[in-house]
């Protein structure tokens, strides 16, 4: 009997040691596919921008349809539903599974879990049934996982509609720099007070949970060039040279833009393509050689931008920064001839 009791105690001790060891630990590898998406959502077309994210969300168990055959991609989310998604991310990351069930009211279990695990604080939201905003979603999702698994891959320092005084600004910038948020335009406009839709939530969810889905971004800033507004990288510098050329340079990307415009009534009614390709080559070569740059190996071809006829010229431009491949577009509108030169010092794939 004593030997049997000893065996039972030894077995119990072994099991008590083995079970915790076999339990899932905090890890991004805990996110695993649990279902197969077979195009069952009739309101999600193959060409819809968020279809890949919706598919991944379904397969990884992050989101379900509003019905077995409907996802409602443009439907709004409530704060409670957004908390459910944040809880699901946290629980799977922490334990390897999602086990939470509805309470009374239905969302109370999820709110309690979020508070207990530091995803939200009591009093963060005045209504859990209100529609969730994009800013609130950023707040929840940035806190669902440890900051260590959301490292910065971008360097976003400014946004058009988010400042240090904007609610949730810290979480918003954190997700931009982690490659989770990209904005609604080239400037990174976020619209923090707009209601978030289910398709947008799917995109954010997949990028938080699956690092390979995160995006590197180069956000632009707007600068004025005469009557025109140009979009240039945030890290780029801009200025006007003594001879009136507008220049944009980015040391980070080893590239630049040179733009100039010449006004002459003689241009009115003309197309730049009245010039031959060789004449265009000669004009550009002489123009650059009269500045601090030198253009060589110029080769021009005729192109069109809608109704505007233009020349596309490739060549090698040498400046005090060194020699680089360049791409030049020259065209006439009204009584102005405009020239825009794109320059890459290291990697000419930027010009493709």
Set out the residue ranges of the language-model regions.
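Short, hydrophobic/aromatic-rich segments at coil-to-beta transitions
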Residues: 218-222, 243-245, 306-316
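Phosphate/pyrophosphate-binding loop motifs in nucleotide- or prenyl diphosphate-using proteins
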Residues: 61, 179
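Short, solvent-exposed coil/turn segments at beta-strand boundaries
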Residues: 231-234, 251-254, 308, 331-339
């Amino acid at each position: 009997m004593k030997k049997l009791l000893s065996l039972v105690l030894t077995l119990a001790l072994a099991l008590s040691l083995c079970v915790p060891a076999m339990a899932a630990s905090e890890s991004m590898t805990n996110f695993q596919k649990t279902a197969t998406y077979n195009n069952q959502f009739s309101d999600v077309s193959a060409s819809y921008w968020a279809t890949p994210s919706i598919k991944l969300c379904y397969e990884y168990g992050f989101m379900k349809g509003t019905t077995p055959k409907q996802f409602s991609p443009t439907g709004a989310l409530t704060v409670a539903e957004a908390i459910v998604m944040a809880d699901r991310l946290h629980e799977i990351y922490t334990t390897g599974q999602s086990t939470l069930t509805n309470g009374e009211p239905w969302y109370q279990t999820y709110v309690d879990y979020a508070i207990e695990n530091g995803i939200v604080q009591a009093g963060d939201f005045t209504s859990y049934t209100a529609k969730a905003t994009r800013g609130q979603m950023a707040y929840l999702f940035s806190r669902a996982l440890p900051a260590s698994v959301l490292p910065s891959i971008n360097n976003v320092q400014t946004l058009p509609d988010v400042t240090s005084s904007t609610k949730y600004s810290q979480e918003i910038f954190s997700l931009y720099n982690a490659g989770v948020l990209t904005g609604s335009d080239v400037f990174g406009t976020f619209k923090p007070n707009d209601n978030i839709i289910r398709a947008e939530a799917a995109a954010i969810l997949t990028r938080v949970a699956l690092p390979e889905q995160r995006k590197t971004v180069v956000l632009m800033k707007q600068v004025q060039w005469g009557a025109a507004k140009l979009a240039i990288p945030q890290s780029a510098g801009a200025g006007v040279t003594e001879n009136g050329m507008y220049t944009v340079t980015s040391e980070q990307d080893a590239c630049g833009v040179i733009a100039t415009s010449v006004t002459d009534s003689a241009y009115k009614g003309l197309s730049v393509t009245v010039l031959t390709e060789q004449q265009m080559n000669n004009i550009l070569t002489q123009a650059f050689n009269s500045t601090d740059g030198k253009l060589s190996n110029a080769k021009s071809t005729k192109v069109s931008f809608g109704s505007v006829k233009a020349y596309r010229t490739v060549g090698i431009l040498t400046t005090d920064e060194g020699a680089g491949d360049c791409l030049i577009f020259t065209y006439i509108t009204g009584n102005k001839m405009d020239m825009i030169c794109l320059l890459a010092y290291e990697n000419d794939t930027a010009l493709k």
